[in-house]
Amino acid sequence: STVASLQRAGPGALSFLANPKYRRHLKTTRASAVVLSGRDARDSPVPVLLSDNPYACYARAARLLYPQETSRCGIHPSAVVDNTAEVDPGAWIGAHAVIEQHAKIGPSVQIGPGCVVGAGVEIGEGSQLVARVTVLAKAHIGRHTTLHPGVVIGSDGFGQAEVEGHWEKVPQLGSVVIGDDVEIGANTTVDRGSIENTVIEQGVKIDNQVQVAHNVFIGAQTAIAACVGISG
């Protein structure tokens, strides 16, 4: 009925072994069952579930045991939604969220508290802006994409032209295009393109506090760990 690490699991818990450095905990685990590969099965004192990819198998089991909350629909009384915005009836707009003119919010989208969806932004079906997320510059967010708290999409890239000893701002005219099934961690920023768009393709996973500068192209299924900076 629960999932737990090898060393902390007790009766009723499912655990897993995917990293050899934790193998020492296998012989003393009290889990009811362990997901592991065939090479480790003989060392387990408890029933095993064999898998070529124990970590992925554990992840799927955890999703079944801890399902996400059912999506809500409607608009919180404190939200501000421009009358030209298109909000699907099956979407949820949370407390103090702002949806600006001509934005398009698709079916089952969840917009959390304090989010800002700028003018002309499009957010695809089933995507989630968790809390205090800002999406600007007519950005396009695909389907089933998650933006964690504090993410900023579409802020200006760093464009400055040196003119006779001072700096002049270079207008940032592009946007941001984010594909389906993308996950972007807390306080990550993705700048709009200077002329062409900044692009994050399908299935990309980005950790917390990453900076993606203007005109960056991130290919499908890329994974990026925390605190990385990617120059434009």
Predicted regions and their residues:
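Structural signal for interior beta-strand "rungs" in well-ordered beta-sheet cores
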Residues: F16, G74-G232
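Terminal amphipathic alpha-helical/low-complexity segments used for targeting or macromolecular assembly
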Residues: S1-S78, G126, A139, H144, ...
